């Protein structure tokens, strides 16, 4: 449902669209001299395919918002483990302050870190955390 950002529950997820967030993130990445590819899919299989593609293309890091699959997807977890690309789990809402079922993540124990609750800024914070770990 990330394609509905800006329309769907703006109190939880913010008012900016995914395109707006990704444009800002891309500009920040470019200013830091790193390349960034962004993808969005509503399907679990599509997300597995994108993760596997990242692994074969030699991607250095993944920033992933598994959204509703956070609490359900062994397939996405297994794909992340299979490619062994370090990743940051991102959530726009403060999942720890939401319903109990949303507080369960199949990914947080294998992630470099988890950032949640900062709406669209969560992606920027994830990228900054990754850049801080890259040695000059």
Residue map of PLM features:
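Glycine-rich phosphate/diphosphate-binding loop of Rossmann-like nucleotide-binding domains
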Residues: 1-31
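Short glycine-rich anion-binding loops that position phosphate/pyrophosphate groups of nucleotides
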Residues: 1-2, 67-70, 93-95
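Short, glycine/charged-enriched secondary-structure capping and boundary segments
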Residues: 8-13, 52-54, 76-80, 102-105
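Short helix-capping segments at alpha-helix termini
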Residues: 30-33, 83-85
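N-terminal small/polar loop signature for handling phosphorylated ligands or for N-terminal nucleophile
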Residues: 41-62, 68-84
